[in-house]
């Protein structure tokens, strides 16, 4: 858990200092992996589901970001943020796709990144409250460096070197379309994926609970059964019959007390 939180904060802080767009995406990937580690080692249903879902989200969002950065480098032959400006005016479709992917990476509600990070934070809050609070600052830092990079690259006046920036081709769109579709789908309706992983998550939590001293708050424990008034009254009735002067009453009470024992032996 500690290493996961360190990865979240370290990746986010270093990403805010990057002037290279590809390196910025790479360090944001470190922060995403920190959320995955935090969710898994929280050992709660929400944490494990969030960690596994965030693993899928990481492949979709970060993979799409690396593809888009590669397309920028192919067109401009540079990764320096300072050399990229005003691309939204010359390639609006490219900017729109980049916007969706970037917002999913920072965890905007309605996209896949929000569901995974929310489950991780909720699950880890149950067992590691202060670590979850510290990890939540990574979400704020992600919004800081990703929005800053987007503003520098796609807004502002178009440089002369960027006026010839080409729009997305149909081949590039065919590659990015499935990724964007899954990003939106998992953000709106993650239930099929969560239900699919639920049995494995439950078995893992039970295994950890049975073979270690860790007690997961996700495991429901049966409450102790209280003795009923009828069960408490039977010994008292036997004692009263034993104290009675009538031998018949004593024999009847003794037979009634021994009947359950004989039935259990059979």
Go through each PLM region and give its residues.
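Hydrophobic transmembrane alpha-helices and their helix-loop junctions in integral membrane proteins
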Residues: 1-149
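Cytoplasmic/organellar membrane-interface segments at the starts of transmembrane helices
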Residues: 91-94, 146-234, 239-266
């Amino acid at each position: 858990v500690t290493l996961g939180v360190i990865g979240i904060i370290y990746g986010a802080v270093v990403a805010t200092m990057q002037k290279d767009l590809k390196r910025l995406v790479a360090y944001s990937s470190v922060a995403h992996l920190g959320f995955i580690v935090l969710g898994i080692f929280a050992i709660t249903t929400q944490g494990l589901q969030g960690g596994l879902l965030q693993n899928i989200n990481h492949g979709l969002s970060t993979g799409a970001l690396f593809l888009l950065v590669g397309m920028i480098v192919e067109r401009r032959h540079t990764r320096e943020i300072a050399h990229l400006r005003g691309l939204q005016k010359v390639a609006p479709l490219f900017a729109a796709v980049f916007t969706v992917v970037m917002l999913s990476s920072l965890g905007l509600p309605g996209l896949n990144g929000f569901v995974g990070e929310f489950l991780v934070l909720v699950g880890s809050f149950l067992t590691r409250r202060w670590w979850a609070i510290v990890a939540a600052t990574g979400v704020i830092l992600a919004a800081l460096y990703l929005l800053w990079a987007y503003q520098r690259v796609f807004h502002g006046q178009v440089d002369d070197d960027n006026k010839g920036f080409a729009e997305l081709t149909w081949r590039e769109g065919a590659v990015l379309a499935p990724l964007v579709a899954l990003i939106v789908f998992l953000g709106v309706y993650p239930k099929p994926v969560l239900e699919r992983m639920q049995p494995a998550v439950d078995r893992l939590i039970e295994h950890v609970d049975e073979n270690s001293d860790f007690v997961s708050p996700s495991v429901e424990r049966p409450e102790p059964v209280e003795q009923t008034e009828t069960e408490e009254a039977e010994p008292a009735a036997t004692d009263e019959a034993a104290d009675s002067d009538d031998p018949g009453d004593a024999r009847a009470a003794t037979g009634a007390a021994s009947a359950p024992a004989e039935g259990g032996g059979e």
